[in-house]
Amino acid sequence: PSKTLLAVRATCFGTVALAFPLSAALVFGAGVDRHRAADTLSVIYCVGLILGVFAAFLPLPSLRAWTRAQRVESVALVFLGMSYATHLSWELGWLVLRDAIASNPNAPWAYAWWAYIDGGDARYAVGDTLLVAMELLSVTNGTVGAVALVRFLRSGRTSIGARLALGATAVVHLYSASLYYASELLEGLPNVGDGFIAVYIKFGLANALWVVAPLFVFRFVYAGLEGVMRDGRKSWLV
Protein backbone atom coordinates (compact mmCIF):
# COMPACT_ATOMS: atom_id res chain seq x y z
CA PRO A 1 0.00 0.00 0.00
CA SER A 2 1.06 3.58 -0.67
CA LYS A 3 2.25 5.31 2.49
CA THR A 4 1.49 8.68 0.91
CA LEU A 5 -2.07 7.62 0.16
CA LEU A 6 -2.50 6.35 3.72
CA ALA A 7 -1.16 9.66 5.05
CA VAL A 8 -3.55 11.68 2.88
CA ARG A 9 -6.51 9.64 4.02
CA ALA A 10 -5.48 9.70 7.67
CA THR A 11 -5.22 13.48 7.44
CA CYS A 12 -8.61 13.83 5.76
CA PHE A 13 -10.58 11.52 8.03
CA GLY A 14 -8.66 12.60 11.12
CA THR A 15 -9.46 16.24 10.43
CA VAL A 16 -13.15 15.41 10.12
CA ALA A 17 -13.14 13.43 13.37
CA LEU A 18 -11.36 16.19 15.28
CA ALA A 19 -13.56 18.92 13.80
CA PHE A 20 -16.62 17.74 15.75
CA PRO A 21 -15.26 18.09 19.31
CA LEU A 22 -13.26 21.19 18.34
CA SER A 23 -16.37 22.85 16.94
CA ALA A 24 -18.32 22.01 20.11
CA ALA A 25 -15.50 23.42 22.24
CA LEU A 26 -15.50 26.67 20.27
CA VAL A 27 -19.28 27.04 20.54
CA PHE A 28 -19.73 26.15 24.19
CA GLY A 29 -16.32 27.14 25.50
CA ALA A 30 -15.36 30.20 23.48
CA GLY A 31 -18.78 31.57 22.57
CA VAL A 32 -18.43 31.17 18.80
CA ASP A 33 -21.75 31.47 16.94
CA ARG A 34 -23.16 27.95 16.66
CA HIS A 35 -24.51 28.42 13.15
CA ARG A 36 -21.21 29.74 11.78
CA ALA A 37 -19.36 26.93 13.51
CA ALA A 38 -21.79 24.39 12.04
CA ASP A 39 -21.33 25.87 8.57
CA THR A 40 -17.56 25.60 8.86
CA LEU A 41 -17.85 22.06 10.21
CA SER A 42 -20.04 21.03 7.28
CA VAL A 43 -17.46 22.29 4.78
CA ILE A 44 -14.65 20.44 6.59
CA TYR A 45 -16.82 17.31 6.70
CA CYS A 46 -17.62 17.37 2.99
CA VAL A 47 -14.12 18.20 1.79
CA GLY A 48 -12.51 15.72 4.18
CA LEU A 49 -14.74 12.78 3.33
CA ILE A 50 -14.80 13.34 -0.43
CA LEU A 51 -11.04 13.88 -0.66
CA GLY A 52 -10.37 10.93 1.64
CA VAL A 53 -12.57 8.54 -0.32
CA PHE A 54 -11.36 9.58 -3.78
CA ALA A 55 -7.71 10.10 -2.82
CA ALA A 56 -6.78 7.04 -4.88
CA PHE A 57 -7.38 9.15 -8.00
CA LEU A 58 -5.02 11.93 -6.92
CA PRO A 59 -1.84 12.31 -9.04
CA LEU A 60 0.40 10.97 -6.29
CA PRO A 61 3.84 9.72 -7.42
CA SER A 62 3.42 6.54 -5.39
CA LEU A 63 0.26 5.68 -7.34
CA ARG A 64 1.68 5.97 -10.85
CA ALA A 65 1.86 2.19 -11.24
CA TRP A 66 -1.69 1.65 -10.01
CA THR A 67 -4.23 0.44 -12.55
CA ARG A 68 -7.69 1.93 -12.82
CA ALA A 69 -9.10 -1.26 -11.27
CA GLN A 70 -6.84 -0.84 -8.23
CA ARG A 71 -7.94 2.76 -7.81
CA VAL A 72 -11.61 1.81 -8.09
CA GLU A 73 -11.17 -0.96 -5.52
CA SER A 74 -9.42 1.44 -3.16
CA VAL A 75 -12.23 3.98 -3.47
CA ALA A 76 -14.89 1.30 -2.99
CA LEU A 77 -13.37 -0.26 0.12
CA VAL A 78 -12.55 3.03 1.82
CA PHE A 79 -16.02 4.39 1.10
CA LEU A 80 -17.63 1.26 2.50
CA GLY A 81 -15.49 1.32 5.64
CA MET A 82 -16.19 5.02 6.20
CA SER A 83 -19.89 4.51 5.58
CA TYR A 84 -20.21 1.59 7.98
CA ALA A 85 -18.38 3.61 10.64
CA THR A 86 -20.82 6.49 10.11
CA HIS A 87 -23.85 4.19 10.33
CA LEU A 88 -22.64 2.59 13.55
CA SER A 89 -21.65 5.84 15.26
CA TRP A 90 -23.49 9.03 14.28
CA GLU A 91 -26.65 7.36 12.94
CA LEU A 92 -26.88 4.66 15.61
CA GLY A 93 -26.28 7.33 18.24
CA TRP A 94 -29.12 9.39 16.84
CA LEU A 95 -31.49 6.41 16.81
CA VAL A 96 -30.76 5.58 20.44
CA LEU A 97 -30.65 9.15 21.75
CA ARG A 98 -32.96 11.01 19.35
CA ASP A 99 -35.43 12.13 22.03
CA ALA A 100 -32.65 13.35 24.31
CA ILE A 101 -30.92 15.06 21.38
CA ALA A 102 -34.11 16.87 20.39
CA SER A 103 -34.65 18.01 23.99
CA ASN A 104 -31.09 19.29 24.48
CA PRO A 105 -30.13 21.57 21.58
CA ASN A 106 -27.76 23.53 23.80
CA ALA A 107 -25.96 20.56 25.35
CA PRO A 108 -22.32 20.15 24.24
CA TRP A 109 -22.71 16.36 23.96
CA ALA A 110 -25.58 16.78 21.48
CA TYR A 111 -23.75 19.24 19.23
CA ALA A 112 -22.45 16.50 16.92
CA TRP A 113 -26.06 16.08 15.75
CA TRP A 114 -27.27 19.66 16.13
CA ALA A 115 -24.45 20.89 13.92
CA TYR A 116 -26.31 19.13 11.10
CA ILE A 117 -29.83 19.86 12.33
CA ASP A 118 -29.10 23.61 12.40
CA GLY A 119 -29.94 24.40 8.80
CA GLY A 120 -29.14 20.98 7.36
CA ASP A 121 -32.25 18.92 8.07
CA ALA A 122 -34.72 19.73 10.83
CA ARG A 123 -36.26 16.26 10.52
CA TYR A 124 -33.53 15.01 12.85
CA ALA A 125 -34.99 17.20 15.59
CA VAL A 126 -38.45 15.74 15.03
CA GLY A 127 -37.65 12.12 14.24
CA ASP A 128 -40.47 11.43 11.79
CA THR A 129 -41.34 7.82 10.99
CA LEU A 130 -39.75 7.78 7.52
CA LEU A 131 -36.45 9.12 8.81
CA VAL A 132 -36.36 6.62 11.67
CA ALA A 133 -37.07 3.80 9.21
CA MET A 134 -34.27 4.97 6.89
CA GLU A 135 -31.80 5.20 9.75
CA LEU A 136 -32.77 1.76 11.04
CA LEU A 137 -32.12 0.42 7.55
CA SER A 138 -28.76 2.21 7.46
CA VAL A 139 -27.65 0.84 10.82
CA THR A 140 -28.67 -2.69 9.83
CA ASN A 141 -26.86 -2.24 6.53
CA GLY A 142 -23.79 -0.99 8.35
CA THR A 143 -23.75 -4.00 10.65
CA VAL A 144 -24.05 -6.49 7.79
CA GLY A 145 -21.49 -4.58 5.76
CA ALA A 146 -18.94 -4.38 8.57
CA VAL A 147 -19.07 -8.17 8.98
CA ALA A 148 -18.72 -8.67 5.22
CA LEU A 149 -15.82 -6.23 4.99
CA VAL A 150 -13.91 -7.98 7.77
CA ARG A 151 -14.49 -11.34 6.09
CA PHE A 152 -13.39 -9.98 2.73
CA LEU A 153 -10.15 -8.56 4.11
CA ARG A 154 -9.40 -11.69 6.15
CA SER A 155 -9.79 -13.79 3.01
CA GLY A 156 -7.02 -11.81 1.36
CA ARG A 157 -9.64 -10.02 -0.76
CA THR A 158 -10.56 -13.27 -2.49
CA SER A 159 -13.99 -14.09 -1.01
CA ILE A 160 -16.58 -13.54 -3.73
CA GLY A 161 -19.41 -14.14 -1.27
CA ALA A 162 -18.17 -11.29 0.92
CA ARG A 163 -17.65 -9.13 -2.17
CA LEU A 164 -21.25 -9.72 -3.22
CA ALA A 165 -22.44 -8.82 0.28
CA LEU A 166 -20.50 -5.55 0.04
CA GLY A 167 -22.19 -4.87 -3.28
CA ALA A 168 -25.58 -5.55 -1.72
CA THR A 169 -24.93 -2.98 0.98
CA ALA A 170 -24.01 -0.46 -1.73
CA VAL A 171 -27.45 -1.03 -3.27
CA VAL A 172 -28.99 -0.11 0.08
CA HIS A 173 -26.72 2.94 0.33
CA LEU A 174 -27.89 4.17 -3.05
CA TYR A 175 -31.54 3.43 -2.29
CA SER A 176 -31.49 5.09 1.14
CA ALA A 177 -29.67 8.19 -0.05
CA SER A 178 -31.96 8.57 -3.07
CA LEU A 179 -35.03 8.21 -0.87
CA TYR A 180 -33.58 10.70 1.61
CA TYR A 181 -33.05 13.29 -1.12
CA ALA A 182 -36.32 12.66 -2.93
CA SER A 183 -38.52 12.73 0.18
CA GLU A 184 -37.27 16.23 1.00
CA LEU A 185 -36.92 17.64 -2.52
CA LEU A 186 -40.44 16.63 -3.55
CA GLU A 187 -41.78 18.51 -0.53
CA GLY A 188 -39.90 21.67 -1.49
CA LEU A 189 -37.13 21.45 1.15
CA PRO A 190 -39.33 22.49 4.10
CA ASN A 191 -36.84 21.12 6.64
CA VAL A 192 -33.70 22.63 5.13
CA GLY A 193 -32.48 26.11 6.06
CA ASP A 194 -31.94 28.99 3.67
CA GLY A 195 -28.63 29.90 2.11
CA PHE A 196 -25.95 28.23 0.05
CA ILE A 197 -24.31 26.30 2.90
CA ALA A 198 -27.58 24.87 4.22
CA VAL A 199 -28.96 23.78 0.86
CA TYR A 200 -25.93 22.86 -1.21
CA ILE A 201 -23.40 21.80 1.42
CA LYS A 202 -25.24 20.43 4.48
CA PHE A 203 -28.17 18.87 2.64
CA GLY A 204 -26.69 18.36 -0.81
CA LEU A 205 -22.97 17.67 -0.80
CA ALA A 206 -22.83 16.07 2.67
CA ASN A 207 -24.95 13.17 1.42
CA ALA A 208 -23.77 13.02 -2.19
CA LEU A 209 -21.10 10.39 -1.51
CA TRP A 210 -23.81 7.82 -0.81
CA VAL A 211 -25.21 8.38 -4.31
CA VAL A 212 -21.95 8.53 -6.27
CA ALA A 213 -19.59 6.12 -4.47
CA PRO A 214 -21.88 3.05 -4.75
CA LEU A 215 -21.22 3.15 -8.50
CA PHE A 216 -17.55 2.48 -7.76
CA VAL A 217 -18.57 -0.39 -5.47
CA PHE A 218 -20.65 -1.92 -8.25
CA ARG A 219 -17.66 -1.74 -10.61
CA PHE A 220 -15.46 -3.32 -7.95
CA VAL A 221 -17.93 -6.20 -7.48
CA TYR A 222 -18.29 -6.70 -11.23
CA ALA A 223 -14.52 -6.89 -11.61
CA GLY A 224 -14.42 -9.67 -9.01
CA LEU A 225 -17.13 -11.62 -10.77
CA GLU A 226 -15.31 -11.22 -14.08
CA GLY A 227 -12.25 -12.78 -12.49
CA VAL A 228 -14.26 -15.73 -11.20
CA MET A 229 -15.82 -16.41 -14.59
CA ARG A 230 -12.47 -16.09 -16.30
CA ASP A 231 -10.72 -18.44 -13.87
CA GLY A 232 -13.63 -20.87 -13.70
CA ARG A 233 -13.62 -21.01 -9.91
CA LYS A 234 -16.27 -23.32 -8.50
CA SER A 235 -16.04 -22.34 -4.84
CA TRP A 236 -16.91 -18.71 -5.59
CA LEU A 237 -18.88 -18.22 -2.37
CA VAL A 238 -15.82 -18.82 -0.19
What residue spans do the PLM features occupy?
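N-terminal membrane topogenic signal
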Residues: P1-V16
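Hydrophobic cores of alpha-helical transmembrane segments in multi-pass inner/ER membrane proteins
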Residues: C46-P59, V144, A206-F220
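Interfacial segments of alpha-helical transmembrane regions
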Residues: W66-L88, V150, R157-V172
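Transmembrane alpha-helix/helix-exit interface in multi-pass inner-membrane proteins
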Residues: Y84-A112
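A loop-to-helix transmembrane entry motif
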Residues: V126-G142
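Terminal transmembrane helical module of multi-pass membrane proteins
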Residues: G195-V238
